[in-house]
Amino acid sequence: MDLIPGFSTETWVLLATSLVLLYLYGTYSHGLFKKLGIPGPRPLPYFGNILGYRKGVDHFDKKCFQQYGKMWGVYDGRQPLLAVTDPNMIKSVLVKECYSVFTNRRSFGPLGAMRNALSLAEDEEWKRIRTLLSPTFTSGKLKEMFPIISHYGDLLVSNLRKEAEKGKPVTMKDIFGAYSMDVITSTAFGVNIDSLNNPQDPFVENSKKLLKFSFFDPFLLSLIFFPFLTPIFEVLNITLFPKSSVNFFTKSVKRMKESRLTDQQKRRVDLLQLMINSQNSKEMDPHKSLSNEELVAQGIIFIFAGYETTSSALSLLAYELATHPDVQQKLQEEIEATFPNKAPPTYDALAQMEYLDMVVNETLRLYPIAARLERACKKDVEIHGVFVPKGTVVVVPVFVLHRDPDLWPEPEEFRPERFSKKHKDTINPYTYLPFGTGPRNCIGMRFALMNMKLALVRVLQNFSFKPCKETQIPLKLTTQGLTQPEKPVVLKILPRDGTVSGA
């Protein structure tokens, strides 16, 4: 039997040509860094280097840093990524050349209405939305929002007390995830939910749908392999964000907005109201104000950016305190000195707590929620003697920077003293980037820090964390999406002095 099909010569030529073209399509960009003399791992056709992410982006970047030094080139599919760790280059990318060259993040496929979200908007649209939203996150506005967040701090204590009374180990993500969800949905959408005790609430269910993400999701991989599919998906109204959830939040915001416009008693100082106010400001050019679609997109991106980051950071913080009882005790002493007899925390006093700030900063050094920062290069440019072609994505590997032994002695150790007043001024600001830096840094940085600090103070006023047999020591991480524990952080919760305040 003939094993080779009896195709005509023309068919064989067509088949061979197709295979060659397919190969060239999947590899044509892969010679870029070799031409530029920039080292890096060898890419595979279509995949590039993404298979190296299977153990986590942090593991991959650390390996590249050890092997290639301060700069290397990799490929996500066919997309070239230039990783830089030199502080001067980082400053050029994130600050100096932000408006002219490195304005935008990498475009990730069909976004639908979410292209209007601050984190995803580009160029002039991003500038306009950022300008409109910036007043929402001033210290004055956050101070006005503080009572809302404080209410959920009390609810957090109440929920923890119930768990502590059971005498069983507690999964930190469940508790802090509920707190984070409650704060975000309350401030961004004006709804009050106790998500730990109401997991079926549609706000909770739709928020969690938004947060399901995997780098190896087939849909996402198809966009990496074949980016030309993006406009086709846009036309078909297929996006990276679940349509049902976006529709739910659109209807909810419309209903909430109408309610607040007709009944002034329902108004309060929160992110939603501040965005509505910006829409209706007489001083605002109506062509520059937020549209209803943009208002919804900001609310959704606040959930996307705020829920996972805060809950993961607090879980990791609790782990470090449980495994460093001396740090936990010292922090509790500062809390007691600042708020005697378990007095309710205040915005101004929280901001002045030096050791609390040190503990939070060191946690975000060890566990930066975003393992990388990315900026797309809009035009050919040379930065500090390195030519960066248009279309290249420049990556700042934050996880690697935060654990570089040349910058941080014994970087794997948890040492809040690194951020004491004595040492803080010696830290190069372009080597510590938990919230990014420059014009496109995290707009919600102050909000996130206030949120975390309030939760930590309220919990430590009433409880102490201790490891238990279910606690994974040492902790292992996964960074295929955001930095989080490979296994949930499970700890024992011990009430202090047998009493719980504010619960």
From Swiss-Prot:
Q: What induces it?
A: P450 can be induced to high levels in liver and other tissues by various foreign compounds, including drugs, pesticides, and carcinogens.
Q: Which residues bind heme?
A: C442
Name the GO terms of the biological process aspect: cellular response to type I interferon; oxidative demethylation; steroid metabolic process
The record's EC number reads 1.14.14.1
Q: Which keywords does this chain's UniProt record carry?
A: Endoplasmic reticulum, Heme, Iron, Membrane, Metal-binding, Microsome, Monooxygenase, Oxidoreductase
The membrane topology term of the UniProt record is:
Peripheral membrane protein
Q: Which InterPro entries match?
A: Cyt_P450, Cyt_P450_CS, Cyt_P450_E_CYP3A, Cyt_P450_E_grp-II, Cyt_P450_sf, Cytochrome_P450_3A
Checking Gene3D superfamilies in the record gives: Cytochrome P450 (1.10.630.10)
Give the protein's cofactors.
heme
Q: Which GO molecular function, any one, fits this protein according to its record?
A: oxidoreductase activity, acting on paired donors, with incorporation or reduction of molecular oxygen, reduced flavin or flavoprotein as one donor, and incorporation of one atom of oxygen
Its protein name is Cytochrome P450 3A29
**Organism for this UniProt entry:** Sus scrofa
Q: Give the gene name.
A: CYP3A29
